[in-house]
């Protein structure tokens, strides 16, 4: 696995107002396994976390940048043959806004306005605007649902290959794989752990209702965790998730093990008054915590 070593320095310089070329984060399937995948996700979180703040000891993503050039991160994904695609990631929410293959770039419908600026994202490429968004509703509308699409090394290889070859008939399915294995894994440590556990050989797994429930409720969890800071950590509104066995799982406060050990990133929500703590430039992981969440809540 290849991860750009200079990205942290670049991000720090950008934070202090130096305008330099954006850095890339790389992940290659050649030699990839659970450990290299964890390193990749940790690096992505580290870049997203620089210059941010924390609530309930969880990183809250940025909601403004000092320069438009800092709005997107580039992530290079390589398949087993070494073919490369580049994802454009919005640092505000970890959404994939588009991708680049060769000299051709594609941007999702309803992406942030800055994503359509060719000088900011994939400069010099031949641009095509897709007719659908990167949301699951649109991606699943003409293809299989998340519960029917396997995740793993081989599905990721197929997804990268389809995008590299510009096979538009497979774009939606390919992005369902990529978004979960990149964006959702960055947001949720518990999803990262589930994926990493299954990254060996030809092994795959299909997301169950517990994982899909987490993905669908990231915004709600982000909002309640931040609003709870004025209420002693108690959520103003309960968040109801679903366990793997189909039982409702109610999250009431920010001390819940799932919140403290399962969530890595929060989307910034403005409807609150919160006291922040400044984050450092490192991201600590705990495999033991992952197992604790799985055991306590039966999510996996």
From Swiss-Prot:
GO process terms (BP): defense response; negative regulation of translation
Statement: the UniProt record of this protein carries the keyword Transmembrane: no
Glycosylation site positions: 26, 57, 117, 129, 253, 284
Enzyme Commission number(s) of this protein: 3.2.2.22
InterPro entries found in the cross-reference section: Ribosome-inact_prot_sf, Ribosome_inactivat_1/2, Ribosome_inactivat_prot, Ribosome_inactivat_prot_CS, Ribosome_inactivat_prot_sub1, Ribosome_inactivat_prot_sub2
Enzymatic reactions: Endohydrolysis of the N-glycosidic bond at one specific adenosine on the 28S rRNA
A GO term for molecular function: toxin activity
Broad EC category: hydrolase
Catalytic residues of the enzyme: 184
Signal peptide limits: 1-23
Source taxon at top rank: Eukaryota
Key words of the record: Glycoprotein, Hydrolase, Plant defense, Protein synthesis inhibitor, Signal, Toxin
A Pfam family it matches: RIP
Functional summary from the UniProt entry: Ribosome-inactivating protein of type 1, inhibits protein synthesis in animal cells.
Family: Belongs to the ribosome-inactivating protein family. Type 1 RIP subfamily.
PANTHER family named among the record's database cross-references: PTHR33453, RIBOSOME-INACTIVATING PROTEIN (PTHR33453:SF34)
Protein name per its UniProtKB record: Ribosome-inactivating protein gynostemmin
UniProt organism field: Gynostemma pentaphyllum (Jiaogulan)
Taxon lineage: Eukaryota, Viridiplantae, Streptophyta, Embryophyta, Tracheophyta
């Amino acid at each position: 696995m290849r991860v750009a070593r200079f990205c942290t320095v670049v991000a720090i310089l950008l934070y202090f107002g130096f305008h330099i070329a954006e850095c890339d984060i790389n992940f290659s399937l050649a030699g990839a396994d659970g450990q290299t995948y964890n390193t990749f996700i940790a690096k992505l979180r580290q870049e997203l976390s620089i210059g941010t703040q924390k609530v309930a000891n969880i990183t809250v993503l940025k909601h403004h940048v000092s320069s438009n050039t800092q709005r997107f991160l580039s992530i290079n994904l390589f398949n087993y043959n070494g073919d490369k695609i580049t994802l454009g990631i919005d640092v505000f929410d970890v959404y994939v806004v588009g991708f680049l293959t060769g000299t051709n770039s594609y941007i999702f419908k309803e992406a942030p306005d800055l994503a359509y600026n060719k000088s900011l994202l994939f400069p010099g490429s031949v641009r095509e605007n897709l007719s659908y968004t990167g949301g699951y509703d649109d991606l699943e509308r003409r293809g299989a649902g998340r519960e029917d699409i396997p995740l793993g090394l081989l599905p990721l290889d197929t997804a990268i290959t389809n995008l590299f070859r510009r096979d538009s008939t497979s774009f939606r399915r390919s992005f369902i794989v990529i978004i979960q294995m990149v964006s959702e894994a960055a947001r949720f440590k518990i999803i990262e752990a589930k994926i990493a556990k299954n990254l060996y050989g030809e092994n795959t797994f299909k997301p169950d209702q517990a994982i899909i429930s987490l993905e669908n409720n990231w915004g709600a969890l982000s909002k309640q965790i931040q609003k709870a800071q004025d209420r002693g950590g108690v959520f103003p509104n309960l968040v109801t998730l679903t366990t793997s066995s189909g039982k409702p799982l109610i999250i009431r406060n920010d001390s819940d093990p799932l919140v403290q050990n399962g969530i890595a990133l929060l989307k910034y929500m403005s409807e609150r008054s919160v006291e922040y703590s400044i984050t450092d430039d490192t991201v600590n992981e705990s495999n033991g915590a992952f197992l604790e969440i799985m055991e306590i809540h039966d999510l996996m």
